[in-house]
Amino acid sequence: MVTALEVPADALIAKLAAYIKENIPEIRPPSWTKFAKTGCFREKPPQNPDWWYYRAASILRKLYKAGRPVGLSELRREYGGRKRRGVAPERVYKAPGNAIRRILQQLEQAQLVRKTREGRVLSPQGKALLDRMAFEILEELTKERPELVKYLPPLVRLKFLSRSGVT
């Protein structure tokens, strides 16, 4: 079966963000997200109005990739960046925890993430969602690039080959 690590990350995150926006009512951006920057190291707020959904999808993928409990501090470090301080040397800052924490809480309400003593882990529903999205992306990529058909599961591969007329 196709996993979320076997497809391009940008395609997975974009598709997952669109799915979250349309189908998961528990995940909604707070009103302050229109004005907030994603860190003190940024000069302006994000230009994409759907950045909340993209960040939620990205967090889901990071939890999937880790395969172990991940804490808020680790996610803050992952989303952190370097701040230009004028004449002073650049310095690395962590991302603010409020947005990440609220997204994790919303993902918990949607039952895509579970909270454990060591941190947050992906729930079976969350893992299934990411794997399903990865499978759909691989099917789309296979239509564009037929050489990727070898990565499809055997039954789907046969169906694809019979439909396309390739033997």
Q: What would you call each of these model-derived segments?
A:
Residues 27-77:
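Short alpha-helical segments that sit at the start of domains
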